[in-house]
Amino acid sequence: MTGKLPLVFCALAALLTGCASVQPTRFYTMSPATAPAATAPAVYSLSVGPVWVPAAVDRPQIVVQTGPNQVLIAEFDRWAEPLKEAIPRVVVENLSLMLGAQDIAIFPQSGSADASYRITIDILRFESLPGKAAIVDARWTVRSTKDEKTGSGRAKITETVRAEGYPELVAAHSRALEQVSGQIARTVRDMAGSKP
């Protein structure tokens, strides 16, 4: 028994050393556009949502593409909020800025039922390629609650990641969502009959 005691202590020491070197978890959030605001405020209200996100990326951890059919779940690099909430939040802030819309809500918050236009978004791809690109492939529908007319579109955006690391990858996703938001804003303007 005394011969096994040093082995037990060595195993315990190795375990404690492993526990002491646990990597800290980092949290990331996407940001809205920094583009100039619309020149004239919108006279209509908007509701954004629901937003559908692929199940493979619908998790707290950032999911990165490591090959054509392979992903890595980054255990210590996480979204600060679920993507199903982050994407509509960023799109709402972008549309508010781009269209001058002050009356804009995220579905199903109060006020969203009375919106002039309802926007639903289906994120078909939300891919993260660290050091390379952020890819957002989105399809949307804008529906007028006044006359039930609809407009739709699709954007396939590949935004270059400017440097290594997760902060740059998340910034690239923010820029990709800015481009998607710009195309959604164009659809809303076309339906509202206003000029860009």
Model-derived features with residue positions:
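Surface-exposed short loop/turn segments
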Residues: A20-A37, A42, M98-K146, V161
